[in-house]
Structures are given as C-alpha cells and as structure tokens.
Swiss-Prot record:
GO terms for molecular function: metal ion binding; rRNA binding; structural constituent of ribosome. Zn(2+) binds at C16, C18, C38, C41. It comes from the Bacteria. The gene is rpmE. Its cofactor is Zn(2+). GO terms for cellular component: ribonucleoprotein complex; ribosome. Belongs to the bacterial ribosomal protein bL31 family. Type A subfamily. PANTHER family: 50S RIBOSOMAL PROTEIN L31, CHLOROPLASTIC, LARGE RIBOSOMAL SUBUNIT PROTEIN BL31C. Part of the 50S ribosomal subunit. InterPro entries: Ribosomal_bL28/bL31-like_sf, Ribosomal_bL31, Ribosomal_bL31_A, Ribosomal_bL31_sf. Binds 1 zinc ion per subunit. This is Large ribosomal subunit protein bL31. Keywords: Metal-binding, Ribonucleoprotein, Ribosomal protein, RNA-binding, rRNA-binding, Zinc. Binds the 23S rRNA. It comes from Streptomyces griseus subsp. griseus (strain JCM 4626 / CBS 651.72 / NBRC 13350 / KCC S-0626 / ISP 5235).
Length: 74
C-alpha cells in the first residue's frame, strides 16, 4: 500500500433512533454515525415482519373472470 494516501480509519460509534448503539471502525471524520434502523429494531431481525402476498396479474385476472381459458367458442 502507498503511504499517506489512505484516509484515517478510526473507531466510530453508531447510534440508532431506538437507543441502541455499538462501536465499529470507519473513515468518518467525527466518529459518530446516526442510523434510522438497526438489528435491534428492524422488523426483519425482531421477527415482527408482515409478509404480504399480493399475487400477480394473472391471479387477479383469474379471480375476476374465472378460469375460462379453454371454454371460449369462436
């Protein structure tokens, strides 16, 4: 590695809006990062996520008009 071209790599305090915080390393100058969500409050990690099955266009069409694909006469 070349000398004197890389940024300073310092310990950084990451704090979440939920109040959780942890220490990591980063090149941020002031040494603090504020995050909106973290692993303690994100629904995916806490198990409170809601899985929405919206279905596709074909499923919505079949629900509206039924499965009459082969019964149409010409």
């Amino acid at each position: 590695m070349k000398r004197d071209i890389h940024p300073e790599y310092v310990e950084t305090q990451v704090s979440c809006t939920c109040g959780a915080s942890f220490t990591t390393r980063s090149t941020i100058d002031n040494g603090t990062i504020r995050a909106d969500v973290c692993s303690e409050c994100h629904p995916f990690y806490t198990g409170k996520q809601k899985i929405l099955d919206t279905g596709g266009r074909v499923a919505r069409f079949e629900a509206r008009f039924g499965k009459a694909a082969g019964s149409a006469s010409k």
